[in-house]
Amino acid sequence: MSAGCTQLVWGGRLHWGASHLLSCLLALCALWVLAAAEPTEGGSANVQGVGEAALYQGRGQHRVPSEDNVAVLSDQWEPSSFQPSSAFSGTDLGTMVADSYRGPGNSDRRSNKELPILLWWSENLFPHFPGDAERIDCPLSSCMVTKNKSVKLHKRTKSIIFYGTDFRAYEAPLPRLPHQTWALFHEESPMNNYVLSHLPGIRLFNYTATFSRESDYPLTLQWLPTIGYLHNPALSMAEKNRWRKNGYAPVLYMQSHCDVPSDRDRYVKELMKHLEIDSYGQCMKNREHPNKRLEDTSTATTEDPEFMAFTARYKFHLAMENAICADYMTEKLWRPMHLGAIPIYRGSPSVRDWMPNNHSIIMIDDFASPKELAEFIMTLDSDDEQYLKYLEYKKPGGTTNTFLLSSMEKREWGVNDMTAPNYLNGFECFVCDKENSRIKAEKTYKKSQQGGAAPEPHIADFNHMGCPMPTPGFGSAQEIPESDSWKQMWLQDYWQSFDQGEALTAMIQRNETNQDRFWDYMHETYIKRSMNH
Ligand SMILES: *[C@@H]1O[C@H](CO)[C@@H](O)[C@H](O)[C@H]1NC(C)=O
Ligand SMILES: *[C@@H]1O[C@H](CO)[C@@H](O)[C@H](O)[C@H]1NC(C)=O
Ligand SMILES: *[C@@H]1O[C@H](CO)[C@@H](O)[C@H](O)[C@H]1NC(C)=O
Ligand SMILES: *[C@@H]1O[C@H](CO)[C@@H](O)[C@H](O)[C@H]1NC(C)=O
């Protein structure tokens, strides 16, 4: 690879002419095909034959990172538009091109058959194409990566990478080998797998990439492509007021995923008693979408221009995440800010840490009741000057949060940015470098005849996810009847997940090799828990 291309891929901040970019892309693709064709030996997987179709089909299941966005405006696809799911899209050049991460610190000259192997347990996510094995050159060192599970017991297989949403305690690879670490990639909602929100579940992993800033490789700002995204101009006040006069409510709600742990509809239902809200999605729907084409895609993630123009007319957007957890923030928050609507937000309790300034969103939980919130919104609706104070972050110099600014500056991956690697390849390299330095440390320790200090284990902590038990969107759990579907579904799911983490931990501790015994362990865990109560 030419130095110029390496810089392009790694540096990401340089400005290059389009033709240079293109030739680098072509060169990289060619190199990549060569690398894939190079034979690998010694037990590492070198398996072709998984068809392109299968690869894309698999990835297709992961196309929609924010589970609420059920519909996709595929016919209006705009390649330039922001899709944080770029990591999953095999057709995205960004994924293909920027998957080499070799940094100036990497002087690794080992051949493929000497390199440690990282196994992607969730093969749908394997961020390489074509083939199912690949050499990766990372900032500090190199590894082989594969999705072929036949290497799972190999002594060179040093780490297994799991996708949180697909991780099933009853399908985990057993026995767990002492020389292997487990790595977790989970950028999606905590509701997709509550096992990871409990200590016994998260501690199964050594390295994590989650939405939490506390994880080893944080993906917290995955839905914010750039700071400039926030500075997109809002519709004028006059125009917004005109839409109000034309019969638009001050507040927009657009959600089609209704039975979620945050139980948001229970709150919205109360709020609607005191405040005009236009609801177009399947949840609490009270209006027909004026545009037939957008009707069944009203919760789309894409930045379809018509969809965006329509939603920008509203002064306020109800921005409620499907689950409540520190640092879990999605497009529900960032998109209204991009459009210049004020988010009325409930989701990450620590959301303020990431806001462009101290006066840019309205937090639902700052208000004692839906009625008080409604009164506040109505005041702002009739006071343009007070309203506009919430958009000052869009003015030059208006984005003052240095934590936000520096976090964006420091992040090494890009969102739909062809010049920066995506976070799947980034995390893979993070694990590769960690494993190589662990191998080195273990060798040094052995040579020292146990003289020095043994390398410390690295184990994920509760706060790498740590999402709290779901609570009702409005009122208290005691007031809600046992027959309520939210109560039946999410409280059970949450606590059953705790038991799953404990059961798997017990299986690992006892060197269990038979996955089928998982439910016996679950039963045992359940009995133990009932006895302790
Ligand atoms: C995985 O690799 C082994 C050995 O290299 C090979 O025999 C097998 O067919 C591969 N499996 C898949 C699913 O490609
Ligand atoms: C927000 O206000 C607090 C104190 O009121 C201050 O410490 C903090 O720096 C402010 N943050 C921003 C982004 O202005
Ligand atoms: C990985 O985590 C497990 C606990 O799940 C721990 O027993 C092991 O020592 C850790 N391995 C390393 C290399 O840190
Ligand atoms: C599990 O295996 C490890 C080493 O392979 C051994 O040290 C440990 O005692 C075993 N544990 C049980 C409960 O058999």
Curated annotation (Swiss-Prot):
Chief location: endoplasmic reticulum
Stretches in topological domain Lumenal: 38-533
Pathway: Protein modification; protein glycosylation
InterPro entries with a match to the protein in the record: Alpha-1_3-FUT_met, Glyco_tran_10_C, Glyco_tran_10_N, Glyco_trans_10, GT10-like_C_sf
Ranges facing Cytoplasmic side: 1-20
Reactions that this protein is recorded to catalyse: L-threonyl-[protein] + GDP-beta-L-fucose = 3-O-(alpha-L-fucosyl)-L-threonyl-[protein] + GDP + H(+); L-seryl-[protein] + GDP-beta-L-fucose = 3-O-(alpha-L-fucosyl)-L-seryl-[protein] + GDP + H(+)
GO cellular component: endoplasmic reticulum; endoplasmic reticulum membrane; Golgi membrane
Transmembrane segment boundaries: 21-37
Superkingdom of origin: Eukaryota
Any GO MF annotation of the entry: peptide-O-fucosyltransferase activity
Keywords (A to Z) from UniProt: Disulfide bond, Endoplasmic reticulum, Glycoprotein, Glycosyltransferase, Membrane, Signal-anchor, Transferase, Transmembrane, Transmembrane helix
Localization in the cell: Endoplasmic reticulum membrane
Cystine crosslinks: C429-C432
Pfam families: Glyco_tran_10_N (PF17039), Glyco_transf_10 (PF00852)
Membrane topology (UniProt): Single-pass type II membrane protein
Family to which the UniProt record says this protein belongs: Belongs to the glycosyltransferase 10 family.
Protein name per the record: GDP-fucose protein O-fucosyltransferase 4
Source species taxonomy: Eukaryota, Metazoa, Chordata, Craniata, Vertebrata
Gene that encodes the chain: fut11
